[in-house]
Regions:
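Acidic glycine-/aspartate-rich tracts in secreted/extracellular proteins
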Residues: 29-30, 68-69, 87-89
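Short, solvent-exposed loop/turn segments at the edges of extracellular beta-sandwich modules
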Residues: 1-4
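Extracellular beta-strand-rich solenoid/capping regions of secreted or surface-exposed proteins
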Residues: 51-56, 71-83, 93-128, 138-156
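Eukaryote-skewed repeat-based solenoidal scaffolds used as protein-protein interaction platforms
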Residues: 146-147, 151-152, 158-160, 165-186
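Acidic Gly/Asp/Thr-rich repetitive segments characteristic of extracellular carbohydrate-active
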Residues: 27-64
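Long, low-hydrophobicity, solvent-exposed regions enriched in small/turn-prone and acidic residues
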Residues: 18-20
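C-terminal edge beta-strand
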Residues: 6-15
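Feature marks extracellular polysaccharide-active and adherence modules
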Residues: 26, 66, 77, 84-86, ...
Length: 186
């Protein structure tokens, strides 16, 4: 402007060069899990990519999640993981479970915290998510007023940028214990 003042508008655009990320998740990938594609470990599921990182990890690991719908229950236990989607409306991590849904692994109800589509455990310090939709796709209609959590975050120093949370009831659960700090930024 003529008065010397400048107004800046902030846009959250993720542009990662091939050196900007460590792992790729692509729902259309049909090769062997963890195989190198363009010098990057590549997986078809977020869970496989997350589980490829050691729980003793000490350095930031950036996972690029390509546009797509990933129907899976994800638990993050390793520190310093970043999940970066290509587009917050086109990169969707979803699961369908409520507190009364039977967990096929245990035969018991998930419970409220267990219904989460994504759980960030307390040891997953420094977790970040950017340009994603985290959704619990449970439909309450015809069911009894059940909680269906999209994100259960128990970790300290978590940051969520341009991340959409979609759920029916109790969408976001900040679930840290009283004795452990859990600074979470949304």
């Amino acid at each position: 402007t003529n008065d010397g003042k400048t107004t800046l508008k902030s846009y959250n655009i993720v542009y990662l060069t091939n050196d900007g990320y460590d792992i790729v998740v692509d729902s259309k990938y049909d090769g062997k899990s963890g195989e190198l594609v363009n010098d990057k470990q590549t997986y078809s599921t977020v869970t496989e990519a997350i589980n490829s990182i050691s729980t003793k990890n000490t350095e930031r690991k950036v996972i690029l999640v390509k546009n797509g719908t990933y129907e899976e229950k994800v638990t993050i236990q390793s520190p310093y993981i970043s999940l970066i989607g290509e587009d917050s409306e086109k990169t969707i991590l979803t699961y369908d479970a409520a507190n009364g849904t039977i967990n096929p692994n245990t035969g018991k109800n998930y419970g409220t915290s267990g219904s989460a589509s994504i759980t960030v455990k307390s040891k997953a310090i420094g977790f970040t998510a950017e340009n994603l939709t985290i959704e619990n796709s449970f439909v309450e209609q015809g069911n009894n007023n059940e909680q269906a959590v999209a994100l259960n975050n128990q970790a300290d120093e978590s940051i969520f940028i341009n991340t959409r949370f979609i759920g029916n009831q109790d969408t976001l659960l900040a679930d840290a214990s009283a004795s452990v700090p859990a600074r979470q930024y949304y």
